[in-house]
């Protein structure tokens, strides 16, 4: 029985230098133009058009506590409507924008997990991937300037464009999060693995074919090892992102600086690693801070298996 529900509002972790999820040594790379804030501004929390009482709590003001008018019993549900504005920082992390891409991830109020230990209310930490969420179905309508191309969790089921804006209707089933990336510089390459459409979003032609090949090989190898990739699309997205790679359902971000011959091996490693997270994080969920062996350790082992399968055991052992 619940008298309150909690949601993560991760953008508030970016509102000042004391709370941002970066180590001090990362600040210059995260904010090449100097620190500027990001946040989420909650305008209203409603149930059946009635205002609900709420409070913003947590070490970084990144937890939304919503008080229920009546107790919510096991098996019951409640509809909560949220109105809010989000400001993205000029930041080259998961959440923010750079010269090439707009990275919109961990951006909306997402329900905290209630498990056998109770509510999980940990703030956005600087170390590791501090995310923990249940699977949900998303139906999203996204309006964006027409000059941008869109990489997204889910399938675009409808697209209406006029001279200035494009309205996307997106459907994403059984995913733990919803992320999207926009750019007016993307070139898109496509291929298929069985019934899976694989998209690679590139910011230049360097290594674009290699990115396609690695994405397809990864889906192939991991599907044979761990069971079929469970979605219809998969997108590998070159991004203004200094941390290497980051996984989201049906979509991974890859540091655009890796797309060159000098970093060819590292690019393959990062794409394969992030693809493995589609099984170890996306399919098999876990609390990534307290149980990292369930996502990072298994993903790292899976990456070794990828190189063994593709190039032989000697390469995998390296």
Pin down the residues of each PLM region:
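Intrinsically disordered, low-complexity Pro/Gly/Ser/Thr-rich segments with frequent PxxP/GP/PP motifs
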Residues: 67-79, 85-86
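Hydrophobic helix-coil surface modules that form long, contiguous segments used
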Residues: 114-115, 129-272, 300-304, 313
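Ligand-binding face of N-terminal immunoglobulin V-set domains in extracellular IgSF glycoproteins
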Residues: 2-13, 18
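Zinc-dependent metallohydrolase catalytic domains
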Residues: 308-318
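Short strand-edge motifs at loop-to-beta-strand transitions and within beta-strands
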Residues: 62-66, 78, 166
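Catalytic Zn2+-binding segment of zinc metalloproteases
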Residues: 275-291, 305
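Extended, low-hydrophobicity, Ser/Thr/Pro/Gly-biased non-transmembrane segments
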Residues: 28-44, 79-181
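Aromatic/His-enriched, Gly/Pro-containing loop or helix-boundary segments
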Residues: 21-46, 51-73, 253-270
């Amino acid at each position: 029985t619940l008298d309150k529900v909690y949601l993560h509002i991760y953008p508030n972790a970016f509102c000042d230098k004391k709370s941002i999820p970066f180590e001090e040594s990362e600040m210059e790379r995260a904010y090449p133009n100097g620190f500027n804030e990001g946040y989420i501004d909650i305008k209203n929390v409603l149930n059946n058009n009635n205002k609900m009482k709420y409070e913003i709590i947590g070490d970084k003001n990144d937890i939304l506590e919503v008080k229920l008018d009546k107790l919510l019993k096991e098996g019951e549900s409640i509809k909560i409507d949220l109105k809010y504005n989000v400001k993205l920082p000029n930041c080259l992390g998961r959440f923010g924008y750079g010269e090439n891409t707009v990275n919109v991830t961990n951006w909306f109020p997402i329900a905290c997990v209630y498990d056998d230990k109770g509510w999980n209310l940990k703030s956005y930490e600087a170390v590791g991937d501090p995310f923990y969420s249940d699977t949900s179905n998303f139906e999203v309508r996204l309006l964006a300037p027409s000059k941008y191309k869109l990489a997204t969790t889910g399938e675009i089921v409808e697209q209406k464009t006029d001279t200035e804006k494009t309205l996307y209707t997106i459907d994403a089933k059984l995913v733990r999060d919803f992320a999207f990336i926009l750019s007016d510089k993307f070139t898109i390459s496509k291929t298929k693995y069985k019934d899976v459409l694989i998209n690679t979003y590139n910011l230049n032609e360097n290594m674009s074919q290699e990115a396609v090949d690695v994405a397809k090989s990864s889906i192939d190898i991991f599907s044979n090892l761990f069971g079929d990739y469970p979605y219809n699309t998969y997108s590998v997205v070159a991004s203004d992102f200094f941390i290497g790679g980051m996984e989201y359902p049906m979509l991974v971000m890859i540091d655009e600086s890796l797309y060159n011959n000098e970093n060819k091996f590292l690019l393959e490693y990062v794409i394969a690693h992030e693809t493995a997270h589609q099984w170890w994080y996306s399919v098999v969920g876990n609390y990534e801070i307290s149980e990292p062996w369930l996502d990072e350790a298994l993903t790292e082992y899976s990456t070794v298996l990828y190189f063994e399968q593709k190039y032989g055991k000697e390469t995998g052992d390296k």
